Swiss-Prot record:
Binding site for [4Fe-4S] cluster 1: C378, C381, C384, C427
Region span, Disordered: 465-568, 580-623, 637-665
Name of the protein in question: Ion-translocating oxidoreductase complex subunit C
Compartments (UniProt record): Cell inner membrane
Metal-binding found in the keyword field: yes
Gene Ontology terms describing biological process: electron transport chain
N-terminal signal peptide: none
EC number: 7.-.-.-
Enzyme class: translocase
Lineage, opening ranks: Bacteria, Pseudomonadati, Pseudomonadota, Gammaproteobacteria, Pasteurellales
Keyword Membrane: yes
Source organism (scientific name): Haemophilus influenzae (strain 86-028NP)
InterPro entries: 4Fe4S_Fe-S-bd (IPR017896), 4Fe4S_Fe_S_CS (IPR017900), Ion_transpt_RnfC/RsxC (IPR010208), Nuo51_FMN-bd (IPR011538), Nuo51_FMN-bd_sf (IPR037225), RnfC_N (IPR026902)
PROSITE patterns: 4FE4S_FER_1, 4FE4S_FER_2
Amino acid sequence: MADVLSRFNSGKLWDFKGGIHPPEMKSQSNSQPLRHLPLGTDFYIPLKQHLGTTGNLLIKEGDYVLKGQALTKGDGLRMLPVHAPTSGTIKSIKPYVATHPSGLDEPTIHLQADGLDQWIERNPIDDFSTLSPEQLIHKIYQAGIAGLGGAVFPTAAKIQSAEQKVKLLIINGAECEPYITCDDRLMRERADEIIKGIRILRYILHPEKVVIAIEDNKPEAISAIRTALQGANDISIRVIPTKYPSGATKQLIYLLTGIEVPSGARSSSIGVLMQNVGTMFAIKRAIINDEPLIERVVTLTGNKIAEKGNYWVRLGTPISQILSDAGYQFDKHFPIFAGGPMMGLELPNLNAPVTKLVNCLLAPDYLEYAEPEAEQACIRCSSCSDACPVNLMPQQLYWFARSEDHKKSEEYALKDCIECGICAYVCPSHIPLIQYFRQEKAKIWQIKEKQKKSDEAKIRFEAKQARMEREEQERKARSQRAAQARREELAQTKGEDPVKAALERLKAKKANETEPTQIKTLTSEKGEVLPDNTDLMAQRKARRLARQQAASQVENQEQQTQPTDAKKAAVAAAIARAKAKKLAQTNSTSEAISNSQTAENEVEKTKSAVEKTEENSTALDPKKAAVAAAIARAKAKKLAQANSTSEAISNSQTAENEVEKQIVR
């Protein structure tokens, strides 16, 4: 910190590497005083005009609003509000073309002016020191002030983040880019208000040194600031050489102190804070006049504009209307740029509105603009590296961007590129290096945003898992406490702990299971000691009887539920008859009479079974038929062995007749 101040106090100016001296072209617009354009009828106010997040709407369609009324609100210093540039009615809130080279739409408020230009109630003050630094920062935030030098970073957030670190406060009045003269004219005409805004910021930050840096090509502005200071020594002026891009933050700090801001760090890390002169004017108007940021100075220049100069322009005014009021000669062959020729953005749609970012509208003719030359191969001449004010290697970054080697692009400090456009300006191969670098930055940003969202999702998932585990543990703890309470209650009412009693019963059961089994013995006739298996044999006998009884029950059940197949039984009987006839021819003993009678009885039984079957059911049971046939064959075989007389033939014939009758039936 002290090193920064000692170097600054030496009064020496350092020169940064690289840089160029393009034609200034500032005389087109800096000779005329600040003017106002006619109040328009339609204003398009984007909800987000700063580097940060969009505020929350305070109005709806059809509402009547006054000039300076807040249309959105935020919940943090980086969520700046936007305000009504005039009084009128809210016609719609919907997407509208953005002031961006992409030409995409963004959420926008359409305000139709009533022509009265009526302010909201304001509370101006004369002495800002009656308010605390915190109150002043809050008022700056409520006024919606963002950096008007081009970065549009929320001013209140920038001040608060550096509040305890600032030793050197630099007010940037360099305005180094060609054509642009809005800061020059503002310093010439509103120097008193700029100085008051600087003193408000000094009161908030308490820096040891405050300096206004102005390029030496603005003698009128330098004189006006000196006059406004009236010999005061609390603010000093440093006149710096005209060189592009001396107005860039890191380059101007190096010019005044000889110290480089570390890569990836902010200027506040070395005790320096920088603000634009236009921002100082806006701070004064917000604190002293109680006016939010609803207008800014815009340079209208280029040979296609008849009334060149610097104008007070209400934010939200369509660019087409501004150009028309300034005498713009429309020509589709020549584009319109928002900003200067080095860092400006080509506008695809002139219906886009002026925002806090727009400091210049450039409308060149054929003498100032030509179609880009055809891109050729890089010849590695090192012109871009020699001219780069940030000590980068644009030719290497070009190859990395083309091959989408994002890791190498970051290793070669692409993020430090200030997009000043010098590399493309000096390139003999007409390579649009800035376009490549902007696209590469956008791709890297998208990759990091995707990774950031993935990490956030992982954190949320892990937090959810931890919460679920915690809730599960709490649930178990509640269950344990409830169980303990029940045990204590039972112990008090019944005199014993149920859990303890259950454990004792379990222990007793295990003890019984482990006791040795007593083996019974008996003594034989010979005096030998033998195991007594009486109980075991009785158990076996009981199990055998149980199995037999179960089988008998199953058989009886099957006989009751499954009827005999009459046809199968008849066939079996016929087979038995044939075998009996064959056997009867060889048997002739008198015993055949009795056996033949037995066969007749069997036939009668079969007949009875068939009749019973026909009475009970018409269903067929193949299994029963097979059993009946087997029984008939066995009985026929037995009869054949006993029959030996000739009478058996007659009896067998009789049996055959009976079977045939049965079949016929």
